[in-house]
Amino acid sequence: MVVGDFPIETDTIVIGAGPGGYVAAIRAAQLGQKVTIVEKGNLGGVCLNVGCIPSKALLHASHRFVEAQHSENLGVIAESVSLNFQKVQEFKSSVVNKLTGGVEGLLKGNKVNIVKGEAYFVDNNSLRVMDEKSAQTYNFKNAIIATGSRPIEIPNFKFGKRVIDSTGALNLQEVPGKLVVVGGGYIGSELGTAFANFGSEVTILEGAKDILGGFEKQMTQPVKKGMKEKGVEIVTEAMAKSAEETDNGVKVTYEAKGEEKTIEADYVLVTVGRRPNTDELGLEELGVKFADRGLLEVDKQSRTSISNIYAIGDIVPGLPLAHKASYEAKVAAEAIDGQAAEVDYIGMPAVCFTEPELATVGYSEAQAKEEGLAIKASKFPYAANGRALSLDDTNGFVKLITLKEDDTLIGAQVVGTGASDIISELGLAIEAGMNAEDIALTIHAHPTLGEMTMEAAEKAIGYPIHTM
């Protein structure tokens, strides 16, 4: 404590107000804690401000732009369709502002004290919060660290005017004529798709043998096919070597198949992963144990090696997903309350908003076989679903992974429009230990895309109606 600085007492202090932090603060407050949340930027964190939400707004606008140009088969003929990208950005910002304002209202409604500034730990029971004008010490009984992550900057690709990260891409004020994307993961693939829809000439440079490495090849094939139809060039096993800004753009040098090549573009978007924000918090001095790559070690209650300090979200091992952070947030808050809550990721989905959408939960077919499990894989195609046909969008499938012995659902994959929504039912089924018959006997509304989970389940038990 600094002389003259009177510390403020609080039960639980949360550092970071993203989808992990603000959820943790609200749940802790609901459980009777006096809660303070510290945020150095905007409430909502990366997800609401420069991540999940604005990227989906841009993607939605890009879909509408494409649909306006290509709906002749539906009898909708639009001539001279144009794009006002400034309006697109205004729409994106309006969505972000509504949600961030909503988060502030929820925090205040739950009597959470909101503090703006940067925090670092003084000891196991106090931290210092500083802004541009002042500093304040807070004493706490428990702390939850939810500081998220930031884009990785790779050698010779220093972020600037033309070399941008995902935040820069989301805030562009023009549609690039040419865009190079370094990294073919979900961020690069989603943003590459959006700008291709807006009219950019997109090249994706991926260092691995394939893009979207977190998904099965069977799932990514339709995505790659769709990208190529949009004119997106995908270069795999490509090593990005340097980016040199020019007067009007950027020159990217990369190596592929032993040959060095260059490509000129208006911008290069670097999406090669994210780094946890665990530095500059004073954690090393406290003796908090770290895992690999700057992540923090935690137990099943999200507790670090220091018993009253918890960590959630992108700063702990596992996929950097907003819904994972929110889930861990509730577990941490309930653990502080003395409950026996523990994390269990068995029903946690992962989604990618490409075209078509990708979603997976539990075991993939390959993972189950690698573990020596005796399984069945049962697929139902979008092309056999009435709702998909009426939407003129039949590219995709629903696949269930069940155990041969009792048809218990242990995994599911969905490719196609609405996959990100369909997967939730299948995650619930896995979480509840349901088998294929449980899903098959559940009456699903007709005509809906959700019926395909029932159809795939009927195939799993050997009695398919609308497929052979």
From Swiss-Prot:
It holds the Pfam family Pyr_redox_2. It comes from the Bacteria. FAD binds at residues 39-47, 56, 119, 314, 322. Its cofactor is FAD. It is found in: Cytoplasm; Membrane. NAD(+) binds at residues 183-187, 206, 271-274. Keywords: Cytoplasm, Disulfide bond, FAD, Flavoprotein, Membrane, NAD, Oxidoreductase, Redox-active center. Disulfide bonds join 47-52. InterPro entries: Class-I_Pyr_Nuc-Dis_Oxidored, FAD/NAD-bd_sf, FAD/NAD-binding_dom, FAD/NAD-linked_Rdtase_dimer_sf, Lipoamide_DH, Pyr_nuc-diS_OxRdtase, Pyr_nucl-diS_OxRdtase_dimer, Pyr_OxRdtase_I_AS. Binds 1 FAD per subunit. It catalyses: N(6)-[(R)-dihydrolipoyl]-L-lysyl-[protein] + NAD(+) = N(6)-[(R)-lipoyl]-L-lysyl-[protein] + NADH + H(+). Belongs to the class-I pyridine nucleotide-disulfide oxidoreductase family. This is Dihydrolipoyl dehydrogenase.
